[in-house]
């Protein structure tokens, strides 16, 4: 469950940074890509927990 909560928090942060990126903030795009990579790793962990 802890992994799922972390994913929810990362998704909220990703949403904020993605919105900022589309408004022209290029550094928010970098943060969004970093968050995407973190989410990918957490999703792999969650997948392992489910199996």
Where on the chain are the PLM-derived regions?
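Polytopic transmembrane helical bundles with strong interfacial aromatic enrichment
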Residues: 3-4, 9-19, 34, 41-51
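Short, charged, amphipathic alpha-helical segments
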Residues: 29-37
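Short, surface-exposed loop/turn segments at secondary-structure junctions
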Residues: 22, 26-30
């Amino acid at each position: 469950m802890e992994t799922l909560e972390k994913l929810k928090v990362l998704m909220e942060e990703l949403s904020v940074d993605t919105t900022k990126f589309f408004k022209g903030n290029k550094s928010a795009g970098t943060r969004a890509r970093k968050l995407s990579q973190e989410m990918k790793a957490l999703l792999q962990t969650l997948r392992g927990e489910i199996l």
